[in-house]
Structures are given as structure tokens and as C-alpha cells.
Amino acid sequence: MNSVERRAIAALSSVLGLRMFGLFLILPVLALYAGEIDGATPAMIGVALGMYGLTQALFQVPFGLLSDRFGRKPLLVAGLLLFALGSVIAARAHSIEVVILGRALQGSGAIASVVLALLADLTREEQRTKAVALVGSSIGFSFLLALMLGPILDAVIGLSGIFWSTGLLALMALPVVVWFVPAVERPSRRGDVQPAWGQVRRVLQNRQLLFMDCGILVLHMVLMAFFVAVPFALLETLELPRDRHWQVYVPVLGAAVLAMVPMLILSMVREHTFPVLRAGVAILLIASLVLLISDRNTGGLVVGLWLFFVAFTLLEALMPSLMSRLVPAQSKGTALGVYNTFQFLGVFIGGALGGWLFGHFGGSGVFIFSAVAVLVWLILVVAVPAPKLLESRTVDLENAEERDFSALVAQFRGLPGVHEVILLPGENIAYLKVDPERFHNESLSKMAGIELQ
């Protein structure tokens, strides 16, 4: 990576990481305030937990499109200011309705799509996958850190203080955007990172992609439903006051990451990727069942939580990588945009439905719902044949001697391991989907003037 790419990745990882850290901080504590906020019922608490997912799903594509017109940095600044405003409103709230409004504003500053677009502007194709992975890892780290620190901060500054802190974090990210994120004079639209409305229908008709979309929806639906019920389980089963919940989250999350890493490494071997996915979903089902039968059972609750976090951290890391290897070369941005939309919808559905179930049926209702949803997912994972995992290559046609594009397509298709060819003559780019076991970059040297980006 060159200096501009390293600077861009560091700055954008910090910006997105700070924002997501602020969103995740309240997950382990908000449900415990059901008796202290005016109008708060379990159902309304669930809506407050998940509301940011609904507005994020609605605004992520518009934010990306607006950044094409008005520039990346102005939209990043606008998104962070919306997040800070939502945090202030939630911090000053005395009723659950105002908390929900604040959470909605937090989610409406949907800068993730803008960050991806800016990464496309500032990184070369051969570095882009690594760049996206590094930015994604900052979100994963933010999630783990927030679950550990949320209960500790709650004990010190309370829920209002946490919301004030999240607003401050958003404002701290503003100087990073203004002074450290490299400037882009002419934002580009790249099909490998940005959505296109015309491709949405085609992506939704792809069964393999729809299967992954539904999977990420279930995963985040279960996550949010759990955080309606689990804090009360810690109170009642472990008889642990909320200012000591960190004593469970910290060791359980640490042990879960240690158990997850070997499985994630194993998944990097092509023939093991899909079996590891199936194992992760199976562990998630077992976790739901263990938590269901662990009423008043301290050991069962801790084991169930550990299994849940093993499964969640594994699937959260594995699924985006698997998704990127399944999507059509020219539709990667659209496919990942749809995938993220399903994820955010899962956040909202899980929070709202989990809260309603907890209010009517208690924790058992939440865990039964989660187990049924994951069981359906597991049946699909086992029943669906493992797909052939391909990789993307982007080819620069600027200096190609052959200008007959139909002839170029025929030449590309004649190379060993090439499964799909999409030419964009206006951009002098070709997208290839290749079998990495059969395709070798050196084979392009036979085509005059052709080189990988």
C-alpha cells in the first residue's frame, strides 16, 4: 500500500469505528432501563434498540448517491452531525418516544456507504479487498469493545452519560474527516463497491445471494432479540447487579474470540469455507437452545452466552468474505448494498419483535423465536449445495491493442479458469470472475496491452 492508501484506511477506520462504537455501547444496558424511562415497555425498548437499523437501511443508499453529487467529505460530515444530534436528543430524553427519535437520527447518518465509496476513490483495485477488510475489522473491534465497556460506563455515568459520550465520539471524528481523510477531486462510481438501482432486481433474483441476505438478516435479528432478554437473565439468574455485568461480558467475549479464530482461519481454505459456515449456524442454534433451557441455571447461561458469541463473531467475520466471492463481478456494489440493507432490517426486526416477545412471554419467548429462526436458516444451509467460490479480477483496457470488444470478450473467455466477463468500454475496464485454482494472472500477458488494475 502507498502512503495515501494507508492514510485513507487509518482515517476511515477511525471514523466508522467511533460511530459504530457509539451505536453498540447501549446494547447491553438499554433494556435494563425499562422501569426508569417514561412510557418504556419491553416492546418500546426493543424498538429503541433496533430503530437505528431501520433508518440506516433507508438512508445508506441515498447517502452514497448524494456523495456522488456533493462530494464524500460533506456527506461524511453531515452523517456524523446527524449522529451527534440524535445522541444529544436521546441523552436529554425523559420518555421512550424521544429516545426512539434520537436512535432514528443516529441511524439516519448512514455513512457506511460513503466510506466504501471513498475507499474506492482512494485505493487501487489490488488493494481494495484488503482495505475493506481492515475497515470492517474496525467495526468488529468496536462491537467487542462496546459490549465490554457499556456496562462499566453505565455504572459510572448512566444511560444519559453514554448517549452524551456517543455524541462526543461523533464530534471527535469530524477533525479526522476534515484534516486527515485525503481529498478526492472527482468522486468515481465503481460497480465493485457502489450500488446501482438498475441491478437490484437482478441481485434479488440470484438465489445464492438471497440466501446470504436472509442469513445476515437472521443473524442480526437474533443478536438484537438477545440483547432484550440477556441483560435480565444476568440480573435474575446470576443475581448480578447491572454495574457488574461487565464481569460476564469481558471474559465470555474474550474466550469466544479465542475459540472463533481457529475456525475462521480454517474457513480460509476453499473446501472448508461452507462447512465452517454450517458449523457456525449450528453453534448459534445450540446457543439458543442452551439459553432456553438454562432458566435459573448459572452455568447454562454462561455457556449459552459463550456459544452465542463464538457463533456470532465467526459468522460476522465469515459472511462478508463469502458474499464477496459469490457476487457477480459488475454487481458487487449493488449486491453488498442489498446485503447491508437486509442486515440493518434484521437489527430493527430483532429489536422490535424481541421486545414484544419478551413483554408477552419473557426470555423463553425470545429464545424460542431465535431457535426457530436459526433452525430454518440451518436447514437451508444444509440443504443448499455449496456454491463454487470464485474471485474477482479487474482488468485495465486503457492500453489494449485489441479494440474490438466482442473479440476481447472471446479472448478472456478462452483463458483457463475464467467464468464470467463483463466489459465496461466507457471506463476501459473489464471485470472477470475466475476460479483461482485454474486462473493465473500471468495468462493475461498473452493479450497485448492488457494488465490487472
Protein language model features and the residues they cover:
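Cytoplasmic helix-loop-helix junction between adjacent transmembrane helices
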Residues: 102-139
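Helix-to-loop junctions at the C-terminal end of transmembrane segments
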Residues: 60-71, 259-273, 358
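Conserved MFS/SLC helix-loop-helix module at the cytosolic interface between two early adjacent transmembrane helices
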Residues: 58-94
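C-terminal membrane-cytosol helix-exit motif in multi-pass small-molecule transporters
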Residues: 168-187, 377-385
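Short amphipathic helix-loop junctions that connect adjacent transmembrane helices
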Residues: 28-42, 228-244
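Residue-level signature of mid-helix packing/kink "hotspots" within the transmembrane helices
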Residues: 53-61, 143-144, 253-261, 347-348
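Juxtamembrane intracellular "pre-TM" segments in multi-pass secondary transporters
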Residues: 1-4, 182-213
